[in-house]
Amino acid sequence: MSSSNTRDIESGMEKPREIDDYSSSYEMNFLESNSRTKHANNSVSKWQDFKDSFKQVDLEELDSSLTEAEKIAILTARSPLKRQLKSRHIQMIAIGGAIGTGLFVGSGDSLSSGGPAGLLIGYGISSSFILCMVCALGELAVEFPISGGFTTYCTRFVDESFGFAANLNYALQWLVTLPLEIVAASITVSYWDTPKKYRDAFVALFWLLIVMINFFGVKGFGEAEFIFSICKVACIIGFIICGICLVCGVRGSYIGGKYWHHPYGAFVGDNAGARFKGTMSVFVSAAFAFSGSELVGLAAAETANPRKTMPKASKQVFWRLTLFYMISLTLVGLLVSHTDPRLIGSSSADAAASPFVIALVSHGIKGL
């Protein structure tokens, strides 16, 4: 073969290789520019979605022949909710939704007014009501996953007036609960000897934190609730382990049921009437403590797959009530006397008045 033919063959082999290199580099540049364009478009669309979330939703006019209940159902179904809550969000909302100020601080008032036995009776009966309610709510949320939450069921299955009353009461509840929780959080900071002028600033700080969480939509709420619930569950489990050790006498002295007997007593009061009255007063604190259990039903409207996640979340309520409430309150009644002056109701309301804190501090546990 001549040298000219050899050069032609080699040049013919090099040309496709050059074309391949050029085409591959072109594809890489195209994909890179395309990804940048998509990223920019996604950023613009997210920012536009954020701005549009503050606008009023445009709804077409409804047929005048529809009843008021049918109009309410249609308008509720058209509400722009996004199903972005995952199974782990719902699980932690079900577990940690009702663990808060009512348990950590409010139970101190119940202990001082009802005694350890009255505390368990009041919370035990209330928890049985909550268990039935959440299970029924879970069934409704699975069968009718509507956007309005559980208050819409009152309008749909009972009456419009009953639904209005339920919505009004629920709105009033959160109008009171939100500032109460914010102030309670700022008061908790005072446990670490924070100057009073800074405690007031914490109210604004916690309020801004809540506002910022809501800026991130339902997904941000789910992640925040997931993290906060894990912290609360970890605190309760840690207290239960520590409380069992203290009751069994790890610190040197066996406690057992000392605070259930004379001169302390299982109930508050010198006669049956006073003891009954003290026990009944526990139901008020228990009702407040269990507020938040209904968040599972509200979150069903924004859950990706409510038919799968809601039954699991509803079934976990039993373990939450048993483990996080009844066991922890039993240990509180064994470790703290209802005559302790530090309990809320007999002194100022601060974090030191929490029976959980008193139970640990009184037995030499430091570093809280």
Where are these regions (language model features)?
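Membrane-interface "cap" regions at the ends of multi-pass membrane proteins
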Residues: 2-108, 112-116, 130-131
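Extracellular loop-to-transmembrane helix junctions
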Residues: 82, 92, 103-202, 212, ...
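Residue-level signature of the transmembrane alpha-helical core
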Residues: 91-99, 123-124, 128, 168, ...
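Hydrophobic alpha-helical transmembrane segments in multi-pass membrane proteins
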Residues: 101, 105, 178, 235-236, ...
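Helix-loop junctions at the membrane interface of multi-pass solute transporters
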Residues: 108-110, 138-139, 143, 151, ...
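Junctions where cytoplasmic loops transition into the N-terminal start of transmembrane alpha-helices
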Residues: 118, 228-231, 297-333
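TM-loop-TM module centered on a large, flexible mid-protein loop between adjacent transmembrane helices
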Residues: 152-154, 159, 191, 266-269, ...
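Membrane-interface loop-to-helix entry segments
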Residues: 200-261, 291, 314-322
